[in-house]
Protein backbone atom coordinates (compact mmCIF):
# COMPACT_ATOMS: atom_id res chain seq x y z
CA UNK A 1 0.00 0.00 0.00
CA UNK A 2 2.94 2.31 0.44
CA UNK A 3 4.05 4.52 -2.43
CA UNK A 4 0.80 4.24 -4.36
CA UNK A 5 0.00 7.38 -6.34
CA UNK A 6 -3.56 8.54 -5.76
CA UNK A 7 -5.87 11.15 -7.26
CA UNK A 8 -7.26 14.08 -5.27
CA UNK A 9 -9.94 11.75 -3.83
CA UNK A 10 -7.44 9.13 -2.66
CA UNK A 11 -8.08 6.61 -5.45
CA UNK A 12 -5.18 4.68 -7.00
CA UNK A 13 -4.37 6.60 -10.21
CA UNK A 14 -4.09 3.31 -12.12
CA UNK A 15 -7.88 3.05 -11.85
CA UNK A 16 -9.81 5.04 -14.45
CA UNK A 17 -13.51 5.82 -14.75
CA UNK A 18 -15.49 6.07 -17.97
CA UNK A 19 -18.98 7.51 -18.17
CA UNK A 20 -21.19 5.50 -20.51
CA UNK A 21 -24.59 6.46 -21.92
CA UNK A 22 -27.21 7.49 -19.38
CA UNK A 23 -29.19 4.34 -20.15
CA UNK A 24 -26.18 2.06 -19.65
CA UNK A 25 -25.11 3.80 -16.42
CA UNK A 26 -28.59 3.28 -14.98
CA UNK A 27 -28.68 -0.32 -16.22
CA UNK A 28 -25.41 -1.00 -14.37
CA UNK A 29 -26.84 0.45 -11.16
CA UNK A 30 -25.74 4.09 -11.07
CA UNK A 31 -28.06 6.96 -10.21
CA UNK A 32 -27.71 10.64 -11.00
CA UNK A 33 -30.11 12.13 -8.48
CA UNK A 34 -27.39 14.69 -7.94
CA UNK A 35 -27.26 16.14 -11.46
CA UNK A 36 -23.49 16.65 -11.43
CA UNK A 37 -22.41 13.04 -10.81
CA UNK A 38 -23.11 9.36 -11.23
CA UNK A 39 -23.37 7.43 -7.96
CA UNK A 40 -23.18 3.68 -7.29
CA UNK A 41 -23.76 2.25 -3.80
CA UNK A 42 -23.98 -1.37 -2.67
CA UNK A 43 -24.17 -2.75 0.84
CA UNK A 44 -21.69 -5.36 1.98
CA UNK A 45 -23.52 -8.51 3.05
CA UNK A 46 -22.29 -10.24 6.18
CA UNK A 47 -23.22 -13.74 7.33
CA UNK A 48 -26.32 -13.87 9.51
CA UNK A 49 -24.29 -14.71 12.62
CA UNK A 50 -24.36 -12.84 15.91
CA UNK A 51 -20.69 -11.86 15.67
CA UNK A 52 -21.43 -9.91 12.48
CA UNK A 53 -24.54 -8.14 13.74
CA UNK A 54 -24.27 -4.40 13.61
CA UNK A 55 -21.94 -4.20 10.61
CA UNK A 56 -23.24 -1.63 8.11
CA UNK A 57 -20.57 -1.22 5.43
CA UNK A 58 -21.14 0.12 1.91
CA UNK A 59 -19.14 0.23 -1.32
CA UNK A 60 -19.55 3.56 -3.13
CA UNK A 61 -18.37 5.01 -6.44
CA UNK A 62 -18.99 8.64 -7.34
CA UNK A 63 -18.08 9.84 -10.84
CA UNK A 64 -18.43 13.58 -11.52
CA UNK A 65 -19.96 14.34 -14.91
CA UNK A 66 -17.44 17.16 -15.48
CA UNK A 67 -14.54 14.69 -15.68
CA UNK A 68 -12.90 15.71 -12.40
CA UNK A 69 -11.47 13.07 -10.07
CA UNK A 70 -13.84 10.29 -9.06
CA UNK A 71 -14.00 8.56 -5.70
CA UNK A 72 -14.27 4.98 -4.52
CA UNK A 73 -15.18 4.66 -0.87
CA UNK A 74 -15.88 1.83 1.52
CA UNK A 75 -17.85 3.40 4.34
CA UNK A 76 -18.86 2.39 7.84
CA UNK A 77 -22.37 3.79 7.84
CA UNK A 78 -22.74 3.44 11.63
CA UNK A 79 -19.79 5.72 12.34
CA UNK A 80 -20.04 7.86 9.18
CA UNK A 81 -16.41 7.31 8.27
CA UNK A 82 -14.25 5.30 5.87
CA UNK A 83 -13.81 1.60 6.63
CA UNK A 84 -10.17 1.06 5.69
CA UNK A 85 -10.28 -2.71 5.32
CA UNK A 86 -7.09 -2.68 3.24
CA UNK A 87 -5.04 -1.09 6.03
CA UNK A 88 -6.60 -3.41 8.62
CA UNK A 89 -5.79 -6.47 6.49
CA UNK A 90 -2.23 -5.21 6.11
CA UNK A 91 -1.97 -5.31 9.91
CA UNK A 92 -4.01 -8.52 10.38
CA UNK A 93 -4.39 -10.55 7.16
CA UNK A 94 -6.86 -12.97 8.77
CA UNK A 95 -9.36 -10.45 10.19
CA UNK A 96 -12.63 -12.04 9.01
CA UNK A 97 -14.85 -8.95 8.71
CA UNK A 98 -12.25 -7.29 6.48
CA UNK A 99 -11.85 -10.44 4.39
CA UNK A 100 -15.62 -10.41 3.78
CA UNK A 101 -15.48 -6.74 2.79
CA UNK A 102 -12.46 -7.30 0.54
CA UNK A 103 -14.11 -10.16 -1.33
CA UNK A 104 -17.29 -8.20 -2.03
CA UNK A 105 -15.46 -4.98 -2.93
CA UNK A 106 -13.39 -6.96 -5.42
CA UNK A 107 -16.59 -8.49 -6.85
CA UNK A 108 -18.10 -5.01 -7.35
CA UNK A 109 -14.85 -3.71 -8.86
CA UNK A 110 -14.86 -6.64 -11.33
CA UNK A 111 -18.53 -5.98 -12.13
CA UNK A 112 -17.84 -2.31 -12.87
CA UNK A 113 -14.78 -3.19 -14.96
CA UNK A 114 -16.65 -5.90 -16.87
CA UNK A 115 -19.31 -3.30 -17.70
CA UNK A 116 -16.77 -0.73 -18.90
CA UNK A 117 -17.20 1.92 -16.20
CA UNK A 118 -13.89 1.27 -14.41
CA UNK A 119 -10.57 0.02 -15.72
CA UNK A 120 -7.02 -0.48 -14.47
CA UNK A 121 -7.72 -2.33 -11.23
CA UNK A 122 -6.12 -5.69 -10.56
CA UNK A 123 -7.51 -7.99 -7.88
CA UNK A 124 -6.01 -7.23 -4.48
CA UNK A 125 -4.31 -3.97 -5.45
CA UNK A 126 -4.85 -0.82 -3.42
CA UNK A 127 -8.03 0.93 -4.44
Protein language model features and the residues they cover:
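Generic structural motif recognizing short loop/turn segments at the entrances and edges of beta-strands
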Residues: 2, 7-12, 35-40, 53-59, ...
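Ser/Thr-rich, low-complexity intrinsically disordered terminal regions
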Residues: 18-20, 26-65, 85
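Charge-rich, low-complexity N-terminal segments
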Residues: 1-28
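Intrinsically disordered, low-complexity regulatory regions enriched in serine/threonine/proline
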Residues: 9-10, 65-127
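Contiguous hydrophobic segments
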Residues: 3-6, 14, 31-33, 52-59, ...
Amino acid sequence: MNNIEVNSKGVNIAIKAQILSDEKMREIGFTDYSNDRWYFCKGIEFPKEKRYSGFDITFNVSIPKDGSDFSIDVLDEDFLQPYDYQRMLNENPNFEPCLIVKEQVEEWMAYLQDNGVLSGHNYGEYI
